[in-house]
Regions:
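Charged, low-complexity intrinsically disordered terminal segments
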Residues: 2-538
Length: 538
């Protein structure tokens, strides 16, 4: 078994214009010797990020991209608002550079004004934050990364990649009582929506790869927007629309761990003129999934915000059809974030069809769950995690839908651990790959939380959760017990666990007819060239 069995070699990325795969003398499209740590929950990530930024000195470099940034979101207690933390860093002489998505109108629940205010706060302190609308019509920059580089102290360098924005709702912890600084979701989530999310902390040479992703976007000479109205508004507001020159990229940090990391992305086939670093777009996230799923034999464990679109899940369905031992667990939001008469079916119709496709392929080997906290409030699942056969693990900004795989900018990292896991079963896939410590520990940490099974990273796991078949059954039993307790009027103590069996609601025919075309156009659009769409290739 080699890395090339699981990871994309440079020619398989499908984008010869990027600098990513040519950064190393050996020509490998991944970096070895990293230390990758999953930071489960926004509170864990924010606490570490606050400590890291606070320790930065003059001459250090802080780079970030975000979908939404709220300047008043606290990383910790009072005085730790993200705008203030970044501003103080810039005032100390840290070089602070950011790219925020310049959104569509706030009236349709996007984030233009908050992004503008965060950018202004950083600029006033001496940093630079650009509002970047270089996307397809209706698209967004969805990448979420922070890179901290330290002049003369490369052992402190770290990059964060995953699903957590620097904004409201994200600062939740394992109790899932929600962020006190909240934005409204569907009413079922209450005034402080519980929020489940994951970010990856990377140390080692992969930090240089993540920085290179930022630099490609920052150095794009294209205007930040093609819209004459947007450019006029920027002129009126005196927005910074010209990226200053970045200091030269320093050498990658030295190897410090056992994790091989591959950086994968989505960029759309941008109309008229593409990105200089991806003229025809890049769909390496989709390609990475397709390659890894060809080796799936035992268990695919997913946590995802959406899980939409038969055009995306067909590669999962094909794996289920080919291999009768393969099981799939998906943890998703029980209720979409918007619950209007038309927005609800627009968000549901793609998921309903995707789950139908998966169940046709895998039958009762496919199980889908929502989460609730101990008060019975649904937990909004915003994590984007996939673990295959305890070997291949992915954490990123990308969801399982056609938008994330083709239309918006996305950033994810695949981790392949060089350390085999000694716990049984040692080779759940049966192909000689052997379970890997990182992938298995990530799956177990997430499953333990959802089962209220205790334990933590690095602690001995219950044997039943290491075994994919037993873990599949443990989820089913926990959800059945909690469903029965709710269905019976909640008699006696609440059963352990947070899992509820997901059952897709029935949509009236009229809603389906109206929602289907709007879903394809507005909610889950396709950013591929027409030939790829017809062949459903990536």
């Amino acid at each position: 078994v080699t890395h090339a069995d699981w990871l994309l070699v440079s020619g398989e990325r499908g984008n010869p214009s990027t600098r990513l795969d040519g950064r190393r003398p050996d020509g490998e499209a991944w970096s070895r010797g990293n230390d990758a740590r999953p930071l489960v929950h926004g509170a864990v990530y924010f606490a570490e990020l606050l400590a890291g930024i606070s320790a930065m000195r003059a001459g250090d470099l802080l780079l970030f991209t975000d979908w939404r940034g709220d300047p008043d979101e606290r990383l910790g207690g009072p005085g730790t608002e993200i705008g203030a933390v970044l501003g103080r860093a810039a005032e100390r002489g840290v070089v602070v550079k950011g790219l925020l998505w310049r959104s569509h109108l706030d009236s349709i629940h996007f984030s233009q004004e908050e992004n503008r205010h965060l950018g202004e706060e950083i600029a006033e302190a001496g940093g630079e934050c650009l509002l970047d609308m270089r996307v397809r019509p209706g698209g967004s920059h969805h990448q979420k990364m922070v890179v901290l580089r330290h002049r003369g102290r490369p052992e402190r360098d770290v990059a964060y990649v995953g699903g957590i924005d620097l904004c409201r709702n994200r600062n939740d912890d394992a109790t899932h009582r929600g962020d006190r600084q909240s934005l409204p979701l569907a009413s079922a989530y209450g005034p402080h929506p519980p929020w489940h999310d994951v970010q990856l902390a990377l140390r080692g040479p992969a930090v240089g790869d993540v920085e290179a992703v930022f630099r490609e976007r920052w150095q794009d000479p294209s205007p930040l927007s093609r819209s004459p109205l947007t450019r006029l508004r920027s002129l009126v507001h005196r927005d910074d629309t010209d990226a200053d020159t970045l200091p030269p990229q320093t050498a990658d940090p030295e190897p410090c761990g056992t994790h091989t990391v591959q950086v994968l992305r989505t960029y759309p086939n941008r109309l008229l003129r593409g990105y200089p670093f991806a003229p025809d777009g890049e769909r390496s996230i989709a390609r990475g999934y397709h390659k890894a799923l060809r080796r799936a034999r035992s268990l695919v464990y997913l946590e995802d915000q959406y899980l939409w679109s038969p055009r995306v899940v067909d590669c999962f369905a094909e794996a289920l059809r080919r291999h009768p031992r393969l099981r799939l667990i998906a943890v998703i939001p029980a209720i979409p974030e918007q619950a209007g008469w038309l927005t609800l079916p627009m968000n549901l119709i793609g998921r309903i069809k995707a789950l139908e496709e998966l169940r046709r392929a895998g039958g009762d080997r496919v199980a889908t769950y929502g989460l609730e906290n101990h008060a019975g409030t649904p937990v909004y699942v915003h994590a984007k995690v996939c673990v295959i056969d305890d070997v291949w693990a992915s954490v990123g900004s990308d969801n399982i839908n056609i938008r994330s795989w083709t239309h918006d900018s996305e950033l994810g990292c695949v981790v392949y651990d060089e350390s085999p896991d000694p716990r049984r079963p040692q080779d759940p896939g049966g192909l000689g790959d052997g379970a890997r410590v990182f992938a298995r520990d990530l799956r177990l940490e997430l499953m333990r939380e959802h089962l209220d099974a205790g334990g933590g990273p690095g602690e001995p796991a219950p044997d039943g959760l290491c075994d994919p078949a037993a873990a599949f059954e443990a989820f089913a039993q926990a959800a059945a017990a909690l469903d029965a307790w709710h269905g019976g009027g909640r008699p006696g103590p609440r059963p352990p666990g947070r899992l509820r069996r997901y059952v897709a609601p029935d949509l009236p025919t009229l809603q389906q007819v109206l929602a289907a075309p709007l879903s394809h156009i507005l909610v889950d659009p396709d950013g591929r060239p027409m030939g790829m769409r017809r062949r459903n290739t990536f």
